[in-house]
């Protein structure tokens, strides 16, 4: 099932309506925005992957689609899912360049496993505070739930030995620092990392200062500049080859967000 913006607008809260309107009004892209359910997603792309993903934003040649698992009855959870994807769509519409798939296996693997997740986290750093402060939609609540689950169920099983293991720990640390604003839960994260991976925490804290400067700053060039800074810091510690860096980091983009 596909629904139009107007059909969805009639089902959502005034705050989410305002976010939806603002995310579309500044765009010159002629492609319409549609909303699809899980069945529509399966028909076009297959099953949601990973399975715990409840929503995603997909650009197509003739339209944009925000998929959520069900769109018949939009409740609080679905509203948060829509707000989350509107954040990504908004940055896309206002000039943050996408990263296209490549046939180079090493580059694509680097994007899928590290550079892509890092960019997503940094996009969250831009719009989580913006959406909460301007539209009173609190995406941090979901982040805090995931953080608590991470500390309890996932972190104990992660190792801190090889470089890939350290990078995974680093990504998770930054992710939950960005996606939660619960001081108690974050303090638990700090304590757990201090015991398990202090070396990773020290690097991540340095990266985090760069990432957190993005909060509510709607400027594509600034985003790219901050992303590049994180890669330079990472290169010092992990010697990540520049040839694997994402294309959007080096391409010129003058759009304002």
Where does each model-flagged region fall?
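Auxiliary, metal-adjacent structural segments of Zn-dependent hydrolase domains
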Residues: 1-64, 71-75, 113-115, 119-121, ...
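Hydrophobic beta-strand residues in large extracellular and virion-surface proteins
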Residues: 66-68, 82-83
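Post-HEXXH active-site segment of zinc metalloproteases
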Residues: 76-77, 91-125
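Short alpha-helical catalytic segment bearing the HExxH-like zincin motif
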Residues: 77-86
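Short alpha-helix boundary/capping elements
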Residues: 90-95, 122, 135, 151, ...
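Short helix/loop segments within enzyme catalytic domains
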Residues: 130-154
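Pan-zinc metallopeptidase signature
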Residues: 149-257
């Amino acid at each position: 099932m596909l629904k139009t913006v107007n059909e969805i607008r009639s089902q959502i809260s005034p705050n989410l309506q305002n976010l939806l309107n603002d995310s579309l009004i500044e765009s010159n892209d002629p492609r319409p925005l549609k909303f699809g359910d899980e069945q529509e997603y399966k028909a076009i792309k297959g099953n949601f992957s990973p399975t715990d993903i409840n929503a995603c934003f997909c650009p197509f040649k003739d339209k944009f689609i925000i998929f959520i698992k069900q769109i018949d009855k939009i409740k609080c959870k679905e509203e948060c899912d829509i707000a989350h994807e509107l954040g990504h769509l908004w940055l896309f519409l206002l000039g943050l360049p996408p990263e296209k798939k490549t046939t180079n296996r090493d580059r694509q693997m680097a994007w899928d496993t590290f550079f892509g997740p890092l960019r997503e986290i940094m996009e969250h750093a831009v719009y989580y505070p913006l959406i909460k402060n301007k539209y009173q939609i609190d995406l941090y609540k979901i982040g805090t739930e995931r953080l608590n689950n991470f500390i309890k169920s996932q972190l104990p099983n992660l190792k801190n030995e090889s470089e890939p293991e350290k990078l995974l720990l680093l990504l998770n640390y930054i992710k939950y620092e960005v996606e939660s604003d619960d001081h108690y839960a974050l303090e638990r994260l700090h304590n757990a990392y201090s015991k398990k991976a202090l070396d990773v925490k020290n690097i991540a804290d340095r990266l985090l200062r760069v990432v957190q400067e993005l909060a509510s700053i709607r400027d594509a060039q600034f985003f790219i500049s901050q992303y590049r800074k994180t890669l330079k810091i990472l290169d010092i510690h992990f010697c990540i080859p520049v040839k694997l860096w994402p294309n959007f980091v080096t391409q010129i983009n003058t759009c304002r967000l």
